[in-house]
């Protein structure tokens, strides 16, 4: 059996790749890794139909080895992380496939409010592969399976305290992607004083991320313009990402959001060590804007876990990804779409700028990313024709741009990013490489 864990936990088509047996075995493995019966593990899920099945299975696995499973129901991943960071729980398990389609699902393990590191993940995977042989406990030592809501209320209270009166009187639109955000964001933002137009707020178990959310913000942009609203905020299925839309309908991605927040903090002297941490996918224009303001950018491999680890090493307070995962380490240990929206509003308030004005400070280079569906996503470097084509295209761009090719860690796709000064040239290169990838890697 190959590796189960990808860049963001275990993912696959529910009941096909990701079965109740795998979820049960993961529960047993997590319980054994805790090395103590009676430990409490908190579990959350997004709105997918398969979530109930997988939560039941992972809960049973935990209970079978003496760990208590505390189910929260439908919550955001940041809500689960907040609960897991509080010291009341030994670990957290989130049942979600984030931005993936409804037929997929996933399992993410958190400890101390953050995703587990590579070393813990490897230990967990070894235990998972031998889960059937792991000893159980006696009837008297079985764990309990219960439902609690107090951790959700504690998370809501933390957001309310962080926001203060920031949203009072604002007219905004949000897209909850028919996912976890629909359970908290509309009511919370209204409680904070905003007038809220809600898109993607009617989950039915099969429509999560369907033509909505942070990966498809076109409908949100149209709603903002049509309603004459101040801005829009798009979350993904488990609400750990934020993509913003300004009053003119222009998209402000994670690079723009990070840039606005970093520049505001640099101006105020509150960006710790004057460092912004982001990944190799982020636009080169972000580096230029931060450098001009007296800061510097540290790059990491793709994945918010890598970002957080680099933030710890550099003692940085702000980092994230172009996709909208943004980590404010002085407040939380993981990306949080709702918290990011609050921090973005703080940055705009502190600088007196609109979202469009804030985003205009960062001159992003033309960049195109194409996700090509391929069966053999890990073979791009060893396929001679494709590898040569990438090298030749990179040489063609020279110092005027860059090419990044990487397999998706969560889907059967290869991501091709081309960045440069000439939009027509980079689009042509990206199309050529994408067509070749589909021909050679399928």
List PLM regions with ranges.
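Gly/Ser/Thr-enriched, mixed-charge loops and adjacent short helices
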Residues: 13, 105-227
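N-terminal small/polar loop signature for handling phosphorylated ligands or for N-terminal nucleophile
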Residues: 31-32, 40-104, 187-245
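Short glycine-rich phosphate-binding loop at a beta-alpha junction
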Residues: 38-46, 70, 171-174, 274-280, ...
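Proline/glycine-rich low-complexity loops and linkers
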Residues: 79, 122-156, 161, 247-322, ...
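Short beta-strand-to-turn element immediately C-terminal to the catalytic PLP-Schiff-base lysine
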Residues: 108-112, 243-247, 291, 327-329, ...
């Amino acid at each position: 059996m190959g590796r189960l864990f990808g860049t963001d936990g275990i993912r696959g088509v529910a009941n096909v790749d990701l079965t109740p047996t795998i979820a049960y075995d993961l529960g047993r493995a997590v319980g054994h890794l805790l090395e103590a019966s009676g430990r409490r593990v908190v579990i959350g899920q997004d709105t997918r139909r398969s979530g109930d099945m997988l939560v039941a299975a992972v809960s049973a696995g935990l209970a079978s080895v003496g760990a208590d499973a505390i189910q929260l129901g439908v919550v955001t991943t940041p809500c689960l992380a907040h609960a897991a960071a509080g010291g009341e729980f030994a670990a957290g398990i989130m049942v979600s496939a984030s931005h993936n389609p409804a037929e997929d699902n996933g399992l993410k393990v958190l400890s101390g409010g953050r995703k587990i590191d590579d070393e813990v993940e490897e230990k967990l995977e070894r235990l998972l592969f031998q889960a059937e042989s792991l000893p159980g406990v006696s009837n008297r030592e079985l764990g309990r399976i219960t439902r609690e809501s107090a951790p959700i209320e504690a998370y809501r209270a933390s957001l309310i305290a962080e926001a203060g009166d920031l949203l009072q009187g604002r007219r905004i639109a949000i897209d909850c992607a028919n996912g976890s955000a629909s359970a908290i964001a509309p009511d919370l933002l209204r409680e904070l004083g905003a007038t809220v137009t809600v898109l993607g707020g009617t989950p039915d178990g099969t429509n999560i991320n369907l033509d909505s959310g942070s990966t498809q913000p076109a409908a949100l942009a149209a709603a903002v313009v049509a309603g004459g609203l101040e801005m829009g905020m798009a979350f993904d299925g488990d609400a750990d990402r934020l993509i913003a839309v300004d009053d003119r309908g222009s998209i402000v991605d994670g690079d723009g959001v990070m840039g606005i927040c970093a520049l505001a903090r640099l101006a105020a002297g509150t960006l710790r060590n004057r460092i912004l941490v982001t990944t190799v996918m982020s636009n080169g224009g972000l580096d230029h804007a931060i450098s001009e303001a007296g800061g510097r950018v540290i790059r990491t491999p793709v994945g918010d876990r890598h970002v957080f680890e680099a933030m710890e090493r550099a003692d940085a307070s702000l980092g994230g990804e172009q996709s909208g995962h943004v980590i404010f380490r002085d407040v939380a240990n993981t990306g949080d779409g709702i918290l990011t929206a609050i921090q973005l509003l703080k940055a705009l308030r502190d600088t007196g700028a609109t979202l469009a004005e804030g985003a205009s400070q960062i001159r992003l280079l033309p960049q195109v990313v194409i996700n090509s569906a391929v069966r053999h996503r890990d073979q791009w470097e060893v396929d001679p024709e494709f590898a040569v084509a990438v090298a030749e295209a990179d040489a063609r761009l020279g110092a005027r741009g860059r090419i990044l090719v990487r397999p998706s860690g969560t889907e059967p796709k290869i991501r091709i990013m081309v960045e440069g000064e000439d939009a027509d040239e980079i689009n042509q290169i990206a199309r050529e490489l994408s067509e070749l990838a589909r021909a050679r890697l399928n």
